[in-house]
Amino acid sequence: MSYEVGTRCWYPDKQQGWIGGEITKHTNLSNKHQLELTLEDNQIVEIESETLDETKDDRLPLLRNPPILEATEDLTSLSYLNEPAVLHAIKARYAQLNIYTYSGIVLIATNPFDRVEQLYSQDMIQAYAGKRRGELEPHLFAIAEEAYRLMKNDKQNQTIVVSGESGAGKTVSAKYIMRYFASVEQNNEENAHHNLEMSETEKKILATNPIMEAFGNAKTTRNDNSSRFGKYLEILFDKEISIIGARIRTYLLERSRLVFQPKSERNYHIFYQLLAGLTNEEKSQLKLTGVEDYHYMNQGGEAQIKGIDDAEEYQTTVEALSLVGISKDTQYQLFKILAALLHIGNVEIKKTRNDASLSSDEPNLAIACELLGIDSFNFAKWITKKQINTRSEKIVSNLNYNQALVARDSVAKFIYSALFEWLVDNINTVLCNPEVASEINSFIGVLDIYGFEHFEKNSFEQFCINYANEKLQQEFNQHVFKLEQEEYVKEEIEWSFIEFNDNQPCIDLIENKLGILSLLDEESRLPAGSDETWTQKLYQTLDKPPTNTVFSKPRFGQTKFVVSHYALDVSYDVEGFIEKNRDTVSDGHLEVLKASTNETLLSILETLDKHAAKLAEKEQVNKKPGPARMVNRKPTLGSIFKQSLIELMGTINSTNVHYIRCIKPNEVKEAWVFDNLMVLSQLRACGVLETIRISCAGFPSRWTYNEFVLRYHILIPSEHWSKMFSSDTTEEDIRDLCRTILGAIVEDKQKYQLGNTKIFFKAGMLAYLEKLRSDRLHNSSVLIQKKVKAVYYRKKYLAIISSIRNFHSRSEGFLTRQRVDLEFKTQAAILIQSMVRSTSTRNKTISLLSAITRLQSLVRKQLAQKELLQRRQRDAAVSIQKKIRAFEPRQSFNTTRRSTVVVQSLVRKKFAQKKLKDLKTEAKSVNHLKEVSYKLENKVIQLTESLAEKVKENKGMTARIQELQQSLNESANIKELLNSQKDEHSKVLQQQKDAHDVQFNEVQEKLVNAKKEVEEAKEEIEQLIAKQDELKAEVRTKIEELNKAKKTFTEFQTQNSDLKNEVKSLKDEIARLQAAVRSGVTSSTITSTPTASRRFSAHSSVADGTSPRQLNVISMNNGGIEDDARSTASALSQINDELYKLLEDTKSLNTEIVEGLLKGFKIPETGVAVELTRKEVLYPARILIIVLSDMWRLGLTKQSESFLAEVLSTIQKLVTNLKGDDMILHGAFWLTNVRELYSFVVFAQESILNDDSYNNGLNEDEYKEYVTLVTELKDDFESLSYNIYNIWLKKLQKDLERKAISAVVMSQSLPGFIAPESSPFLPKLFSQSSHYKMDDILTFFNNIYWSMKTYHVETEVFREVIMTLLKYVDAICFNDLIMRRNFLSWKRGLQLNYNVTRLEEWCKSHQLPEGTECLQHMLQASKLLQLKKANLEDINIIWEICSSLKPAQIQKLISQYAVADYEVPIPQEILNFVADRVKKESSLSSDGKSQTHSSDIFLSVDSGPFEDPFGQIETREFGKIEAYIPAWLNLPITRRVVELVTQHVTVQESQRTE
């Protein structure tokens, strides 16, 4: 061992267990080593020893590990595996909010006493699913996943043993393990998503947790939810590795808790849940009140648990009971039994001198008996009396008061324990029925069992618990030993037998024929057996060799005995051992209970009898041959527990075992507080230190050859390893290099062994190698610095000499130049002075002359302006007078003219109204309508002319107003001009003020007069405006009347047109009927024609895609019109007949559309240079629109429904089945076509609802049918669009998921900053390169962009798709990044930043600047990796920059940072500061509640369902649809339909034109 100055070590401490220190002095005098140790509290300790071997002298301090190893994830990787190193490693990880640590095969789980739900989220389950242990950080799920994989691959049953003392978190750990198994199946199924619902069986398995916790857990001083029983849950799997059921075994329920609770503790949760959750009516029926009223509940004084709502827990329990098949009625019966137990506890027994008495009328007794359905008299009798059965008679005797209390409590405990067993039996019946049992292929067992316990007073319960832990510890030690030796054999290394502490003597002490349990059973079966007698037998039998090594009696007293357990010696108090072991209820009470009228109670007792019978059968089978016994003895609680423990160990030994040791870090249950001494005692008790001791006896540290060479090759000269970088390096070369390294640096060959795949090291060797490596790096860095500094300072010296010489020469030249320059400057100064003086004199003269000239010009200007102003004022006055005098006559004339026009229009209106009445009576005549139409047209023309005249007059008045307004503006300008002139006169001609004042007053008078005139003009203008408004109102009235007249005229036109069409149709029909009669054709061939004709008027406008137009009807005196009308109607009828036949045959049409159009089409190509028209892209939708609209036009509503149902289903199937390269193009293609179809349906709905012209020829029922059909179709297409969008986007996400992590996280595109992905050695064998690059991601986004652009998908939809995918990339890459170990470095940060920046640039180049916001988490994570982390200021900077990251995420990234060899490791103080800041900020954000990890470290991955972005934008506009079918499509029926529709539209258009 090395104790050089500066060596860090550990020294024992009473308060902290161990304290850190450093060797500050080491001397060696007289063969004695004198060490001076400075502790962390500055205390100095001096140690003197003859040896430096810590195993030979306990006074020597224990060596401390290098800082880089102190917070290791696996304790076995510590170089110095000693007690303080293990404690410090767990403490360091706990301080960094890491509650899990490996210790070989054991997972150590330290209770955080905080809410850390994010550690067990579905994202975390998904992260660990399929991962090997060691790939990710230590976690509960890593153990569960390992068990699941081994069961699946090796076909071997598994067991997970969860142990620890009360409050360590065993129950929570077991619960989350069960949740993992219930969730992991879905994560491993193809195309499954982690949000899928669990199966009914899995829900039932998880429902057992709240049930067992309610009936078997209670609040203790150490734990608010302490399990008071042991539980082994087998999760059952079938051949397909699917969960099909479960089985529960329970061990040693703490019966005494029902009747007694220590201070600050509670009874079982279910009682408090009942009182909080039952309704007042139910409480009244059960005669229940408050907690304080019941003896069985008020002894502890703690009725409430902080942060727990018993009413909510009651609802959870009730729901769980219902889920496992216990009906509401049965639940109520259970609650009646529980209420009865509370009333039994309140039964008051009267105390006499020697006996006890109890009346059957005692109120609490009466209520209890009523609820249980038993006889109160007999029940009361057997509380105060006992019966002894002899061979000849039964003897009944009285009990004293204390015995009566025991009898009362015994029957209560008996009923509750029986109820608990009945619950477990019912759960097993539901979860493992015969059908399930027949399909069981394998199972994973989860053992949640009490840890080693030792209190001031230890009783029967602690004895059984510690006995179970002895058995488990023995199995654990053997398992660890076995694994160690298997590893050595597998690697074929030399090894010797590893000694370890075997606790078999302690187990023999308990189990042997003359052991503690046997003597206890023997004494319990004696009627007069007592604790004192049993104690004496123990002393006599066991306090002698060989058992006295593990058994002893205390120095004082005769009521205790001491057992030396593997963890420590425990003193047991014998009081109550006999009574608890008997665990009996009197035969009298048993008979009373079995006579109950409560069927549930009888069922509970029957279950108990069945269990007793099974136990008796097992004892009979296991009984050794010998003389037959006369009596069947009732099994004691100790024997039952022993038998069940033997069965449990048999089960565990037959499975592959995994261990989880739960640690309680402090007694006060305060979040993230670590008590060294308490944890240390638990590490000793749970066997972790023993495991490490076994490992230390062999080769605890092991490295692969490649890892060893990668780290320690620098310890030998480079000529040995430089050639290893070549591509032809083999594994044998690597092994030879390892031998060379070890041979050069390790003298003792016993310190290591070379295996087949690994190198094994003794304890302390890694620290030695690390020291050599750090020394080599230090020496190398010093040498490099020396050489670099030498070169640097020599260059600096030569540069200084050269600069001095240059300075001398340059200084002399500078001084010479300075003298010459001074002479030149002197001459120049004289010349400049002379020039300046002459220039100054010249400028003064010029300035004076200029001022005189300017004054003269100003005077002349003033006089000229005055004369000009007078002239303008005179002209303006004349002009205003002229316009005002002309205004009144003109106004009078216009008024007279308007009045005349109004009178004329009113008269004409009266005549028109009269004429209208006449026209209405003559409307039946078609010829008369024509004449009327012509006259009305003339009337419209006249009215239009009249309106034009009115408008013209209005324009004239407006022009007049504008002229007056202009005059007013001119007057205002005059005023402004005068004011400006006044200012100029005041400044320039101050000396002429008096003369100018006279003139100014005259001008002022004129201005006042002008203002008066302007005011009068304003009043006149206002009057004109008022009159103009009146004229406008009158004109509007006339226009409204004119519009009414035009509307009336339009109605006549419409009626005329309809009548003409009707007449033509009837004539054509008559002609056809006559022709049919003449040719002998039957009437059956034209039965569909009237329907088609009737539908025509309703949907013809939809068929051609144009809006309905009103046509003017103009009378024509052409004799050939009627013949043309007949031929047109005949053509339309023929087209409609053929269309009807084609569309009515939906089977042929559907087959052709589905197979030929939908499934057999070719997607138009996309790309940068490809531009497709809408008809080339949307032809499938438009063909369907044409077919659909004509089906509606011809009344084929039923056929259209079946047709569309087939189309919708086919399109959705096509998108669902998209794979590979077709996914992007086909998805975008169908997205835009479905949008086109949806837009058409919306257009059709709006047309039918808002335009009456579409409804002509439809009765009310037909109209409702069409409205309903279109509304349903709208919903169907909306759903189809939503489904297609979601299916397509999820497929894009799935394709992106394969590429994103490899491209964004793994790929290294930035040259010069490549981080090593693996060892530089063996490049061909071990190199791993990312499968996808960033170019693949950009190509992916480019394909989406061009497909959506080419296929005319709306821009808003494109933006939403890209933003969703970018957020998805950000989330999955960040979640992958944050879970990576030994990966996060500053070089990786640069590469990440470069990769994400390329995505940002793509977004900006495609007009998506907001895309940067979607990638914030990855950007900030990359920045975090690049920033310094050396001090607290750096951490504050990181916190400011990484504003989008949660505190827990920042802490996780920093703690995962992989420090390079040339970097300084992040100090432990910094890591602790970050963790403390996370706790502080989370505490503040949760309003004082302790929720350190209230936020998940994972980002939420949005995997749908997504909102359809089409729902947020307007539908597409519809014009005339161009019929287009590509030539390569084989659609004969569809082509004919389109041709006929085109012909129909052509004929209809020609008819409209005529």
UniProtKB/Swiss-Prot annotation:
Residues 778-798, 800-824, 825-847, 848-872, 873-895, 896-925 form the IQ domain. Residues 1082-1093 have a biased composition (Low complexity). Residues 1098-1109 have a biased composition (Polar residues). It comes from Lachancea kluyveri (strain ATCC 58438 / CBS 3082 / BCRC 21498 / NBRC 1685 / JCM 7257 / NCYC 543 / NRRL Y-12651). PROSITE patterns: DILUTE (PS51126), IQ (PS50096), MYOSIN_MOTOR (PS51456), SH3_LIKE (PS51844). Residues 926-1079 form a coiled coil. PANTHER family: DILUTE CLASS UNCONVENTIONAL MYOSIN, ISOFORM C, MYOSIN. This is Myosin-2. Transmembrane segments: none annotated. Myosin heavy chain that is required for the cell cycle-regulated transport of various organelles and proteins for their segregation. Functions by binding with its tail domain to receptor proteins on organelles and exerting force with its N-terminal motor domain against actin filaments, thereby transporting its cargo along polarized actin cables. It holds the Pfam family Myosin_head. ATP binds at G164, E165, S166, G167, A168, G169, K170, T171. SUPFAM superfamilies: Myosin S1 fragment, N-terminal domain (SSF50084), P-loop containing nucleoside triphosphate hydrolases (SSF52540). InterPro entries: Dilute_dom, Fungal_Myo2/2A_CBD, Kinesin_motor_dom_sf, Myosin_head_motor_dom-like, Myosin_N, MYSc_Myo5, P-loop_NTPase. Residues 1205-1480 form the Dilute domain. One of its GO terms (molecular function) is ATP binding. Residues 4-57 form the Myosin N-terminal SH3-like domain. One of its GO terms (cellular component) is membrane. Residues 1082-1109 are annotated as: Disordered. The keyword Transport applies. Residues 70-774 form the Myosin motor domain. Keywords: Actin-binding, ATP-binding, Cell cycle, Coiled coil, Motor protein, Myosin, Nucleotide-binding, Protein transport, Repeat, Transport. Homodimer. Interacts with calmodulin (CMD1) and the myosin light chain MLC1 through its IQ repeats. CDD domains: fMyo2p_CBD, MYSc_Myo5. Residues 443-523 are annotated as: Actin-binding. It comes from the Eukaryota.
